[in-house]
């Protein structure tokens, strides 16, 4: 991923989720290798994952709604420090606005996945725990659906905040 794509994809919005819920989440390894077998979750852990997915999905819907209504600056205002350390508000807003202008208005959006990742220091992505909400979105000026991604980072205060928004 190019630095500009990474910068454009980093942003934050508060989502409700507790640290104990994150502790129950299996994380994906950073390296591009097959994931180790995931541990079997207890029914209580699975219920926590399901609740967290619903909360994060609601938060992601708010983010895309703000982007859809040209309120991208508000997304940046609530972003994680991880995102704010990589891109300033003006760059974030102008990059997303330019990308969305090319695509036109969203016509249909379907959530296709909620994924979890953990990154260690020294990589292309800042260290930490992330949850991503992936949409297949049809836009007025795009013949095929576009992958729309909203990422959240678990900040030091144990609050999930938007760490990215990207289109591919």
Language-model regions, residue ranges each:
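Short solvent-exposed beta->alpha transition segments
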Residues: 57-58, 73-130
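Bacterial N-terminal signal peptides that target proteins for export
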Residues: 1-7
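Exposed beta-sheet edge and beta->alpha loop/turn motif
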Residues: 115-168
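Acidic, low-complexity intrinsically disordered segments
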Residues: 51, 58, 62, 66, ...
